[in-house]
Amino acid sequence: MEPAQQPPPQPAPQGPAPPSVSPAGTPAAPPAPPAGHQVVHVRGDSETDLEALFNAVMNPKTANVPQTVPMRLRKLPDSFFKPPEPKSHSRQASTDAGTAGALTPQHVRAHSSPASLQLGAVSPGTLTASGVVSGPAAAPAAQHLRQSSFEIPDDVPLPAGWEMAKTSSGQRYFLNHNDQTTTWQDPRKAMLSQLNVPAPASPAVPQTLMNSASGPLPDGWEQAMTQDGEVYYINHKNKTTSWLDPRLDPRFAMNQRITQSAPVKQPPPLAPQSPQGGVLGGGSSNQQQQIQLQQLQMEKERLRLKQQELFRQAIRNINPSTANAPKCQELALRSQLPTLEQDGGTPNAVSSPGMSQELRTMTTNSSDPFLNSGTYHSRDESTDSGLSMSSYSIPRTPDDFLNSVDEMDTGDTISQSTLPSQQSRFPDYLEALPGTNVDLGTLEGDAMNIEGEELMPSLQEALSSEILDVESVLAATKLDKESFLTWL
């Protein structure tokens, strides 16, 4: 017999191996992927599964919800199914109103007016149930109806016909053999509350009698009561009413303390006088004040006249040949500016009434009143920026080109020696005047009015070609340390 021929070996499949089938016919779990590889599962029924989830939520009746175990069949303790017993009788649930069944809470209407608060609140007193403070002399005050929040001890005797017993859990209850009932409420609390009930109150007494320590009302005040029993006060002096007790006013209390502590001094008897003398004597204080006021006004007038005299002397010292009438008036107006501020804008005899309003306006603006304002003086535009004698301009002409003032041809012969002499004629106090800046150039004669057209030819003759050549000046080669130009 020939040996059986072996079948040729099958080549290894190139694709993934099919899942093995178990003997039961169910596919086995796929093998684990090798390390570093991920397996992505693609399911075609994902949309169907999502719809099923939404349907289970939207339509719970039609959804196949698995049956849960009933609560009774679960292993829960017995206390889970028993409701808690009422704890109104226990210490944890005790309230202040333990005798709610016997006595209902009674709230007394409190007075909304401040008049119910008497001065007895400051002094030792007690607080009644109605909220009114009464003094020591008042009737016995009623205590609060609040009950104790703790259990009454067992040694306190019970009322007749009552008996206390305890349940199996140790809770106390009470037996009433009179009517054969049981209750959780302690009858001893009702007894204590009945003892605290005040006696029937007497008819309403006016609060003035109730609090005798408050003292009498101030002069001109009266106490009254409305139909509801609320107290108010009438002030006959100014014919007003108020809820507030005037005796509670701190000003009245202070005055009352002062009058009580300080001894009362009788006024000295007045000497017999005639009817006219009596009227004058009554207003002596007013007369003294008027006399002092008149003295102050007279002193102020004397100072004003003295100041005017000083200014007139200063005007007389000015040379009449160089100071004409309009400029004297200008100086007088300048000198009167401080006086106008002190006197409230009253013009002096030197100035006219028509000028006072404009001077007052210019003074309040805190500027020079003679700069481009009014018809009294107008400063012309200056073209000699470096040669003006005004204190408002800054000379910028180099000193090298103005060696001496004599070289300028101004057309008018001006002596250099006359300028210092004229400046020396002005008093020094003119420079110290507040709010003014006396321009000496405006106070000189007409000879000092140097026109710019006459000054320009002399400047053009003195200027060199280098200073007029801007390009050569701005060149870097022309600038050195010895240059007369200073760049800022």
From Swiss-Prot:
Q: List the disulfide bonds.
A: none
Q: Where is this region: Disordered?
A: 1-47, 76-99, 261-293, 339-393
Q: What cellular component terms from Gene Ontology apply here?
A: bicellular tight junction; cell-cell junction; cytoplasm; cytosol; female germ cell nucleus; membrane; mitochondrion; nucleoplasm
Which segments show compositional bias classed as Polar residues? 348-376, 384-393
Q: Which InterPro entries match?
A: TEADIR3_omega_loop, WW_dom, WW_dom_sf, YAP1
Recorded GO molecular functions are: chromatin binding; DNA-binding transcription factor binding; proline-rich region binding; RNA polymerase II cis-regulatory region sequence-specific DNA binding; transcription cis-regulatory region binding; transcription coactivator activity; transcription corepressor activity
Q: What is known of its domains?
A: The first coiled-coil region mediates most of the interaction with TEAD transcription factors.
UniProt entry keywords in alphabetical sequence: Activator, Cell junction, Cell membrane, Coiled coil, Cytoplasm, Membrane, Nucleus, Phosphoprotein, Proto-oncogene, Repeat, Repressor, Tight junction, Transcription, Transcription regulation, Ubl conjugation
In this UniProt entry, the residues modified to Phosphotyrosine are Y392
Recorded hits in Gene3D superfamilies, A to Z, give: 2.20.70.10, 6.20.430.10
User: What ranges does the record list as Pro residues composition bias?
Assistant: 1-21
The highest taxon in the source lineage is Eukaryota
PROSITE patterns hit by this protein: WW_DOMAIN_1, WW_DOMAIN_2
The answer on whether this UniProt entry bears the keyword Ribosomal protein reads no
N6-lactoyllysine: which positions carry it? K75
One Pfam annotation reads TEADIR3
Q: Which residues carry this modification: Phosphothreonine?
A: T48, T95, T104, T397
Q: Note down the stretches annotated as region Transactivation domain.
A: 276-488
User: What's the chief localization of this chain?
Assistant: cytoplasm
Record flagged with keyword Hydrolase: no
Domain WW, chain residue ranges per copy: 156-189, 215-248
Q: What does this protein do?
A: Transcriptional regulator with dual roles as a coactivator and corepressor. Critical downstream regulatory target in the Hippo signaling pathway, crucial for organ size control and tumor suppression by restricting proliferation and promoting apoptosis. The Hippo signaling pathway core involves a kinase cascade featuring STK3/MST2 and STK4/MST1, along with its regulatory partner SAV1, which phosphorylates and activates LATS1/2 in complex with their regulatory protein, MOB1. This activation leads to the phosphorylation and inactivation of the YAP1 oncoprotein and WWTR1/TAZ.
Listed name of the protein: Transcriptional coactivator YAP1
Q: How does it assemble?
A: Part of a complex when phosphorylated that contains DSG3, PKP1, YAP1 and YWHAG; the complex is required for localization of DSG3 and YAP1 to the cell membrane in keratinocytes. Binds to the SH3 domain of the YES kinase. Binds to WBP1 and WBP2. Binds, in vitro, through the WW1 domain, to neural isoforms of ENAH that contain the PPSY motif. The phosphorylated form interacts with YWHAB. Interacts (via WW domains) with LATS1 (via PPxY motif 2). Interacts with LATS2. Interacts (via WW domain 1) with isoform JM-A of ERBB4 (via PPxY motif 2). Interacts with TEAD1, TEAD2 and TEAD3.
* Modified sites of kind Phosphoserine: 46, 90, 94, 112-113, 116, 123, 149, 274, 352, 356, 366-367, 373, 382, 385, 388
Q: Which gene encodes it?
A: Yap1
